Amino acid sequence: AFNVGSMFRDPDNALLPNWKHIPVGYHGRSSSIVASGEPIFRPKGQQKLNDQENPIFGPTKLLDFELEMGFITFDGKSLGEHITTDEADHYIFGMCLFNDWSARDIQKWEYVPLGPFLAKNFASSMSCWIVPLDALEPFRTNGPIQAPKILPYLEYKGDKHIDINLSVSIETPNGEEKTVCNSNYKHM
């Protein structure tokens, strides 16, 4: 979030005031989820170049991804009924790797004032493997201390984070595998 905020604003104002208080999410299209390994097309959209007054239309030049985890859920509650943080695990079947693709130049132009739309809804890659939540129990751990203190409806008890090492590698044009990011889900 800090890196993207720095791209769109500046490092001193990278995270907006609500960042530490609201769980951030985007509503994507289920029709744009593809299996891991499927080709991703380069989306077209409006972009605002720094040296031009008006936007242009064309293919993104800043295609990016975000390493994420997907949650596969059971049936939820009735429309309008709240699932508490204590109940959440009862509604989750399992987890999978999930890469959210982003067209950053399109996103930069369209995200104010309503947030990204076309820049983030064109593709998401989902692993073909789902790991049941029960299988991840031995890897439960404490998460980072949240500061500032979060609102009561977001508070939780116990080990809700999961210690999963994550990495992303890409294949270079000459066929070499290059690791481009490493993380751990317990920090997410």
Where are these regions (language model features)?
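Active-site microenvironments in enzyme catalytic cores
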Residues: A1-C181
